[in-house]
């Protein structure tokens, strides 16, 4: 599958999702550090050999892609990415020209959380809608992608681990769980450095309003009620994307069940 020139071997950070009719979508990080997809319409027996890049060319570094699908062609993908194109070719953490690999990212690279939607991912020329979701970086500098080669830069850069994920509920609403390494003064801009980007705070974004991944549901609206928790435990922000809004819940484990 996806054996065109842009595909690394072995693939990195791969993930597969299936829709309600068993069409399959395989995602991975390509050799140019973009997120790529290969599709199967026969339950994974055969795959198309030409992959599709689903992350914008402006995102020059990406890692940890995760995906879920609803009805045929309706998918959402999340990943960490950077648009710091000026850092390409500059010395990485090993002093070599940086090629966009997040594992070797220099200190002037910031990684944000992105989400990419498609409602026609099975079409010959599918349309993808992408938005940078997080208002501040998730990580600054390098992200350890090889547990045998992590670096101590103000603490281990393995702080994010690799436990990000994306799921949908019975209404087709998207939820994104991720580890946030840049919090406090790192997020506020007062000290946005790799050394201050070593948190591991669990956070969740979910779709506030926009199209469900189940066609019969139509457009989703925001929940009628906000979880009854102290303000200091929950920070909620509506962030625009082309046809939907995402909401962030910080410290989700503190949310009480009703």
Task: List the model feature ranges, each with a label.
Residues 37, 196-198, 230, 252-255:
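Intrinsically disordered, low-complexity sequence elements enriched in Ser/Thr/Gly/Pro
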């Amino acid at each position: 599958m996806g054996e065109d020139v842009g595909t690394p071997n072995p693939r990195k950070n791969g993930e597969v999702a299936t829709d309600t009719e068993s069409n399959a979508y395989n995602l991975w990080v390509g050799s140019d550090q973009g997120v790529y997809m290969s599709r199967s319409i026969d339950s994974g027996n055969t795959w198309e050999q030409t992959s599709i890049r689903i992350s914008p060319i402006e995102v020059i570094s990406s890692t940890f892609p995760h995906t879920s699908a609803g009805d045929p062609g309706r998918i959402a993908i999340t990943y960490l990415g950077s648009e710091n194109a000026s850092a390409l070719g500059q010395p990485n953490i090993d002093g070599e020209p940086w090629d966009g690999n997040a594992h070797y990212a220099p200190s002037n690279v910031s990684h944000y959380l992105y989400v990419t939607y498609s409602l026609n991912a099975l079409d010959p020329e599918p349309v993808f809608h992408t938005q940078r979701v997080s208002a501040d970086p998730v990580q600054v500098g390098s992200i350890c992608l090889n547990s045998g080669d992590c670096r101590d830069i103000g603490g281990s850069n393995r702080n994010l681990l690799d436990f990000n994920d994306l799921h949908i509920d019975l209404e087709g609403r998207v939820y994104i769980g991720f580890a946030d390494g840049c919090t406090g003064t790192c997020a506020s801009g007062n000290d946005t450095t790799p050394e201050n980007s070593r948190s591991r705070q669990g956070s969740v974004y979910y779709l506030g309003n926009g199209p469900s991944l189940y066609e019969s549901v139509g457009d989703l609206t925001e929940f009628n009620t906000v979880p009854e928790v102290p303000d200091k435990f929950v920070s909620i922000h509506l962030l625009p994307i082309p046809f939907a809004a995402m909401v962030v819940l910080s410290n989700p484990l503190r949310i009480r069940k009703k």
